[in-house]
Each structure stands twice: as C-alpha cells, then as structure tokens.
Amino acid sequence: RVATIDTLAPDDCYDLVFVTLQAGQLPDVLPILKQNRSEYFVFVGNDPHAVEVMQAMQRPADKIAFGFQSSGGHRDVDKVVSAHVGVGMTIGGATAPLSGVFRYRVKTAFEGAKYKLTFVSDMDGWLKCHLALILPACYLCYACSGDLSKATKEQRDMVLDAAWEACEMLKAAHIPVDDKENTDCYRAGTPGRRKMDAMVLTLCKTPLGRLCVSDHAMHAVAEMQYLDEAFEGLRARTSVRMTAWDALRSQMPSWDIMRKKTAKARR
C-alpha cells in the first residue's frame, strides 16, 4: 500500500511530490504546493491547463511534470476494484521533455515495480488530445444514464467521429496533435478506426465499460463539467464545425441535472 499525505507544510521536503486530484480541485491547493520547498512535482490526472499550472508553481519548467495513469475502477465499502492492462504512466513536461535529473528521480521512484513509464515531450498537448476521446465517452455515459450497454451503433460511431473532430479543432487552435496516436485512429475508414470501433463496442458490451469509463464519469460529474468547459474554451478560439460532437453532447442531460442526480444518489 502506497503511503499518502493530505497535508503539506511549507518546510516539508520530499524527493518527489505526486499530486493526485480531480480536475477542478487543483486551483484550491496550488497556493499550498507553491509554498512548499520540495523541488520536483508531478501532477497526475486529467488537466486541461497544464501550462497555467506550471506557471502558477513559479518554478523552472524542468521541475514540474504532468502524468496520466491508464487505469479505471471504483471504490466499494470495503475495497477498491481496479481495472488496468499493464499499469503505467505517461509523463513529461508541459511543453518540453523532462530533464535527465527529473527522469532519473521518477525512474528511481518506480524501480523494482512492474510499472511502465512512457516519457513524452508535450504533456499539455497529450492531455488535451486525451480529452478529445474522454469527453465524448462521458457524454455517451450520461446519455445512457451510466449504462453503456444501451448505446446504439450510431452513438458508438458518434463517439469516434466526435474525437476526430476534436483533434481537428485542437490543431486549428495550434495545439500539437500526434496524428498517428490520435486523428488517424478516429478517421472513418482507416485501420486505426476499425480497431477503435472494436474497442468501443467491447467497452459498451462488457463490464470493462463500467470499470474503465462509466464509473468515473457518473461519480465525477463536477470534474467532467470542468473539463467540458475548458474544452469549450479552446473550441471558442477556432471556427471548426463539430457536428458529431454537438449531436452527442446534446443527448446528455444538462450539467445542472447531472449534478442534482449525483447529489441525490449520495444521500
């Protein structure tokens, strides 16, 4: 079991500080993190504002990293159910590769663990591209009241069509997009798209969809709304038409209704 802390005094010092919060919670703790004397920080999770976070920390760019762990699951009363295929993390600087010293510290932290580290040079772009798929999947979850088995073929297709549109929008907004890992996987008629079609079908027709997608979407409505609003802010900088995106998004209840449903379920 990994030891964690829920307080961080200015004089506390760690070799590495991993910050794991839902998107939207970070602004409240950034002042505390900024005052701490530790040198190296890794912000883990969905973050549409990596560059802004890096700047707010007021440290050299090579002292701040962003990471994303590909896993899913849910918490029961007495246990945590986890879903993952080869646990690991994609990690890197917001807009530049990590320094050799930083990479060494991260590798040392996971030494001896069966944990794959994938280093990239532009995590701000990577995270935004990640949202290009995550948000349409989220809209589908809400449209189906969390039961992905109810999704129609048309809706499944719209998820990937919307992801392709989102990648095109990001490029128009001058966000770096790795076409091989993103756009080419969502473009209709390509081998990559056929693989993604199979993946989406599997998620919708097996328990993997609940573990990997809908559990998180249904229990993190505030986070998903925060990510949605951030993505809409990016979109406002472009004139790219996103018909599949808009059609799928229009099928979900309003964010206000989703928040009320979440609050009612917690009572």
Language-model features, listed with the residues they occupy:
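Rossmann-fold dinucleotide-binding core
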Residues: 49-130
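Helix-loop-beta segment of a Rossmann-like dinucleotide-binding subdomain
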Residues: 80-94, 142-151, 208-218
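Rossmann-like NAD(P)(H) cofactor-binding subdomain of soluble oxidoreductases
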Residues: 1-80
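Active-site-proximal catalytic alpha-helix in oxidoreductases
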Residues: 124-167
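NAD(P)-dependent Rossmann-like dehydrogenase/reductase catalytic/cofactor-binding core
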Residues: 171-267
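Flavin-binding catalytic cores
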Residues: 110, 155-180
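Generic structural signal for well-ordered, non-membrane alpha-helical segments
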Residues: 99, 103, 155-163, 220-228, ...
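Inter-helical turn/loop segments and adjacent helix faces that build the functional surface
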Residues: 114, 118, 146-153, 234-242
